[in-house]
């Protein structure tokens, strides 16, 4: 059978099968803000949408509604450090960050090419690589250095068919942020696709610097959107921002975005008001997440079999469990104990036993779930003796 994932096994894995059989469990994997009480103020959304209905007229633009691009440029002008973005030529509005990734894969690669991506990452990259018939080469993150990128691995993995480097900063799920220039990227000269969707959720650092500000001389496509920043995954809007060295790709990217025109006009028209009036919500959401992370880390600090590093940013914790059992067995036993977490191998990491926990989960479910996690882990590790 030809086509996408034609030969793949898409049946449910043992963890999903067990989860479907259990009803009384607390889900500590949830990343949906609308299911965790983080709802962007409806009065602001109503205000943002009202002018569209009064003057409704579809005027498609392959780069996105100019007012939306102006709002995005204004956002980057307020980042630390600030980025100067030309809304006329540097911004492309998309239906989502995932769509922006797909556009950039189409822009930068041909079948048989390869891109470098972090070894620990979510499955999106693998699916995109399959879609575009390219090779995904995984570069490791160094756990001894706070999951920092190993520059020598980037150099080792690249060859004449390497077309781009994917960087997720803040990284999902380790929370690592690239805070300084990586000289080998300058030497390679490859375009960088930088995913910054967790940029407004710092924890162990005061702010998340835009990579395009840290490395201004390398072609960088910066991706973000309203799904994480404003807890609006249902309104479907993202963007790609080009720094000056990346402008050479703008004309071809315009053709690609014009081919899809995925971003809907209503959400684009709402964006200036969302960004202008949404700052208080962003701060409130950040404070809730920071409090949740601190609560969970304090609770886990008393558990001898657990090691957890404070994330630079984001809302995930990447937890190491000191056990002889494999991750799948641990997660299945935790499900039986009434709590659901993801194993590290779901994110492509197969060293030791790591669990991924979302601190977006609302109280009291978060504290109750963490208590079940702690109790379950103590029983699991006790069985190792």
Show where each model-derived region lies.
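Conserved core segment of the aminotransferase class I/II
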Residues: 213-290, 297-298, 376-377, 382
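Conserved PLP-anchoring active-site segment centered on the Schiff-base-forming lysine
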Residues: 107-129
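N-terminal small-domain helix-loop-helix segment of the aminotransferase-like
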Residues: 7-96, 274-277, 379-380, 385
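A short helix->loop->beta-strand "cap" motif at the edges of active sites that frequently abuts
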Residues: 113, 134, 187-191, 196, ...
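PLP-dependent enzyme catalytic core of the Aspartate aminotransferase-like
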Residues: 74, 78, 82-85, 155, ...
